[in-house]
């Protein structure tokens, strides 16, 4: 069964396919998707499925199809410094990509029903910060996750510039979601089988646009306590960064700008050239249904369509192009930090205690 786009061989290949099918349309969203390897959020033994345009579920752990996340990221129209709330934050994959766009002065909160999934998300977040080659290339708004039902958020909670809900919202909960949004903000959620973008244009005015026909599992209704009322859930605080943290942000920013100026002066491109890839002919598909635990695009490709696609795949090669062994990525920011005349403990702090 085919997806909305062809399966990729790796994360970059998947992103190339999403771009070709016009699911990813802006450079900012593309950079975030390339920086976070979707395969890192899969359990061991399931990673082979990470680069297919399909949803994945194992127990309470769930990832939506890449084309869904692409549409969500584009519809949110994220900007640095905004506040974001992820209702049903799951593995933290989407929240981490959002954090790369929000930058260090944004707010990035997530609420997730299952405590084991929150622990999984925190582990994946720590792994990204400590191990990812992408981390030092961005200024990051680290997500903060809490356990709870998103229909039980305390009434005195703050509002957000951008909100995404990753479960089907019933019509009678629509206004509840809207109240969490600031004037001028954008809410993206599945409602009545449509992934919908809602913009708050005034205190009591809204503009809605359907993005995609989808079928999401509905929000879990809150359970009641002994008093017959559901317990309220407090969202993370909107904390102000301390001076030590601000110093780290600005030192890293200054060094990163210095590196960029050096590279520009030497005529060194700051981005790797695009990968040569196979030609594919694939139709964009805008309807999705759940089959078991998988979100499957409809209509499905026939065997004849798949054979035609395979026949059209050709490797594009540059003239004289030869295979070269891959060199380990060079972390110029880390090198600059390590040359600073500072105690080793401060250097470790500036690198977020990363070892690479």
From Swiss-Prot:
The keyword Plastid does not apply. Residues 240-250 are annotated as: BC-box. It is found in: Cytoplasm; Membrane. One of its GO terms (cellular component) is cytoplasm. The active site is at residue 64. Disulfide bonds: none annotated. Residues 319-331 have a biased composition (Basic and acidic residues). Residues 85-94, 160-164, 181-191 are annotated as: AdoMet binding motif. A lipid is attached at residue 2 (N-myristoyl glycine). GO terms for biological process: protein ubiquitination. Residues 301-318 have a biased composition (Acidic residues). It is a lipid-anchor. Keywords: Cytoplasm, Lipoprotein, Membrane, Myristate. Residues 340-343 are annotated as: CUL-box. Component of the probable ECS(PCMTD1) E3 ubiquitin-protein ligase complex, at least composed of CUL5, ELOB, ELOC, RBX2 and PCMTD1. Interacts (via the BC-box) with ELOB and ELOC; the interaction is direct and stabilizes PCMTD1. Substrate recognition component of an ECS (Elongin BC-CUL5-SOCS-box protein) E3 ubiquitin ligase complex which mediates the ubiquitination and subsequent proteasomal degradation of target proteins. Specifically binds to the methyltransferase cofactor S-adenosylmethionine (AdoMet) via the N-terminal AdoMet binding motif, but does not display methyltransferase activity. May provide an alternate maintenance pathway for modified proteins by acting as a damage-specific E3 ubiquitin ligase adaptor protein. This is Protein-L-isoaspartate O-methyltransferase domain-containing protein 1. It comes from Bos taurus. The lineage of its organism: Eukaryota, Metazoa, Chordata, Craniata, Vertebrata.
């Amino acid at each position: 069964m085919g997806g909305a786009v062809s399966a990729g061989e790796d994360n970059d290949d998947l992103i190339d396919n999403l771009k070709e099918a016009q699911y990813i349309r802006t450079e900012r969203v593309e950079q975030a998707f390339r920086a976070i390897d979707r395969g890192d959020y899969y359990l061991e033994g399931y990673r082979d499925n990470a680069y297919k345009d399909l949803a994945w579920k194992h127990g309470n752990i769930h990832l939506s199809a890449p084309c869904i996340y692409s549409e969500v990221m584009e519809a949110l129209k994220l900007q640095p410094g905004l506040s974001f709330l992820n209702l049903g934050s799951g593995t933290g994959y989407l929240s981490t990509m959002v954090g790369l766009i929000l930058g260090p002065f944004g707010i990035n909160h997530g609420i997730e029903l299952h405590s084991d999934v929150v622990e999984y998300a925190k582990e994946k977040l720590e792994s990204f910060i400590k191990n990812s080659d992408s981390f030092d290339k961005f200024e990051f708004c680290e997500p903060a996750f809490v356990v709870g039902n998103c229909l039980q958020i305390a009434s005195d909670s703050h509002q957000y510039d951008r909100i995404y809900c990753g479960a089907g919202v019933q019509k009678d909960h629509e206004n509840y979601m809207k109240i969490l949004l600031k004037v001028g903000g954008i809410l993206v959620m599945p409602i009545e089988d449509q992934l919908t973008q809602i913009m708050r244009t005034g205190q009591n005015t809204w503009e809605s646009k359907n993005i995609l026909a989808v079928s999401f599992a509905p929000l879990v209704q809150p359970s009641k306590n002994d008093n017959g009322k559901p317990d309220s859930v407090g969202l993370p605080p909107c904390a102000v960064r301390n001076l030590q943290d601000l110093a780290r942000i600005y030192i890293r920013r200054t060094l990163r700008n210095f590196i960029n100026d050096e590279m520009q002066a030497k005529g060194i491109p700051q981005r790797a050239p695009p990968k040569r890839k196979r030609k594919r002919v694939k139709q964009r598909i805008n309807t999705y249904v759940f089959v078991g635990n998988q979100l499957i695009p409809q209509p499905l490709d026939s065997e004849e369509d798949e054979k035609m696609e395979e026949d059209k795949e050709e490797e594009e090669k540059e003239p004289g192009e030869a295979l070269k062994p891959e060199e380990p990525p060079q972390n110029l920011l880390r090198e600059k930090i390590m040359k600073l005349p500072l105690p080793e403990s401060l250097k470790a702090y500036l690198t977020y205690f990363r070892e690479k």
